Each structure stands twice: as C-alpha cells, then as structure tokens.
A protein has these predicted regions:
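Hydrophobic alpha-helical membrane-insertion segments
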Residues: 49-77
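Residue-level signal for the membrane-embedded core of alpha-helical transmembrane segments
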Residues: 18-25, 53, 57, 116-120
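Hydrophobic alpha-helical transmembrane segments
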Residues: 16, 90-123
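Compact alpha-helical subdomains of small soluble proteins
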Residues: 67, 99-102, 130
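Transmembrane alpha-helical segments in integral membrane proteins
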Residues: 26-36, 107-131
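Juxtamembrane non-transmembrane "cap" segments at the membrane-aqueous interface
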Residues: 67-94
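Membrane-interface helix-boundary motifs at transmembrane edges
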Residues: 35-46
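Cytosolic-side membrane-entry/anchor segment at the start of a transmembrane helix
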Residues: 1-32
C-alpha cells in the first residue's frame, strides 16, 4: 500500500465516521429535548427510567464513535510506519499519533474530553431525576 492510498483510506474512514458522529449529535440533542419535556410536563417513574436508558445509550453511542475516530488515526499511523521510505509528512504523523496498535476504548484518552462527557451525563441525569 502506498502513502497516498493510506491517506485516501483515512479520508474515507473520516467521512464515514463523520456521518455517524453527526447522527450521534442529533440524538444527543433529542435526549436534551426529552429532558426539557420531562421538566416542563413532569413524568412518571417508568418514563424517567426509559429516558435515562435512552440518554445513557446515546452517550455510549457517541463515545464509541469517537473511539473509532481515534482508531482511524492510529491505524493510519501504523500503516505509514510499515512503509519502506515514508515521507517527512508521514514521519510527522507517526511522531504525533504514535505507531502502536490500539483497540477501541469508551474511555477518552483526552482528559478534557472525558470531563466534557461526564458533564453531559450529569446534565442529562439531573435534568431527568431532579426538579
């Protein structure tokens, strides 16, 4: 595989991941709209349980999609490291991303991103269960 093909494959994977991430953001918006409906109109216990499951499922989905984005970066970097004569640009990417094999993880590697998702979960849960 050539360097061009690796970058082309990375670009294609980002397009696909971007579509799934956009869907995840839409679903997150739907979850927050559901929280507003619960706060405005009230809800029974079973409705709150289902809203909780729906919200946590959306957070799980989004964390999974963002882990795939990280895996795309790292897989491309690993593929570049297997080239016989990588370019300077490829070397910079390998230095920045690393060249070790990785598996998807729901725990974000960036601590700020992890805190952001924790805040989203707290906002959803307090909106559903507290009034």
């Amino acid at each position: 595989m050539t360097e061009y093909e690796i970058y082309n494959q990375l670009s294609s994977s980002f397009i696909a991941s971007g579509l799934f991430v956009a869907g995840g953001w839409f679903l997150l918006w739907v979850a927050f709209r559901g929280v507003l409906r619960i706060q405005d109109n009230g809800a029974t216990l079973i409705q709150k349980v289902f809203a909780t499951l729906f919200s946590l499922g959306i957070v799980y989905y989004n964390l999974l999609q963002f882990s795939f984005v990280t895996v795309n970066w790292q897989n491309a970097s690993e593929a570049l490291s297997l080239l016989d004569n990588p370019s300077e640009r490829a070397q910079r990417m390998m230095d920045f991303v690393g060249t070790t094999e990785v598996s998807p993880s729901l725990i974000p590697s960036d601590p700020i991103f992890a805190v952001w998702w924790l805040v989203v979960i707290v906002m959803l849960m307090t909106g559903i269960w507290l009034k």
